[in-house]
């Protein structure tokens, strides 16, 4: 991570002092406002925010912020100029020659979501896919049998905080008070992953959670109580913590706030990420995916993702483990060109960058020799 990258990956560009003071007030007031009124206010605000983003090109753009992708392409272009027309070997982003990766995640916010776990698992079984489930540890009773059902389906159990109240990062004292219990639940559940309630985040503190990876940073998200985004469609490190950005708009954002009627925006964004070799991270809440229409949206998305060629479907914990392996390989290689045989032993692959008709083209090893 370069200092320039960190400015975006850690959201240093976001001015947050005022919003941090207001977040606890927002969550306290929320309890006394009828849900219908809440949703009306949030939908009105989301429509206005969307309009301003589209009209003014506000940063980060939504649903696609291409800044770091473009920066990566500029660096590649400079290397290609120095190579004088020769293609450049690269360490591939994904194992075994896959061109992109995709992973499925669910935040279980309350009892309704807990009761809906099996319905979403059944949809996933039909498509032969697996997912990660993040549970709130102390807001609702969690039958250990539910965690076993998730694990038996080949899925992953993660932690979604202690309470879904937006207060984890309200102060350093409060954060430190919760750390021992957060770490205990991670150990007891055998969980490697954490996602902060309401995706509230603090890049400086999150490495202390005790998780192997976090998935709380959206790449771009102007519609929440903590707007912003890391602008990345690739994993990255916060200290020793692997960050897996949420790169598709949440189902709640699309269908609850913006009241979209189909999955075309999901498809557009997923296709763009795949073309640029990124990580497609899906977040669907079982608390909201209850009606047949919402379940059908999820089924359509799975069919679309399964049909994309060249993708690596994996659990988030496996993506995070791979990113550690890849980082170690990158350190070992230094400036040396990657050797295909050595990479293959580590499950990695070599990519090639070339410039054709003024555009940068990335090819996997097999396509480069085809």
Q: Locations of the language-model features?
A:
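Acidic, His- and aromatic-enriched active-site or binding-groove loops in soluble protein domains
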Residues: 154-164, 211-227, 235-237
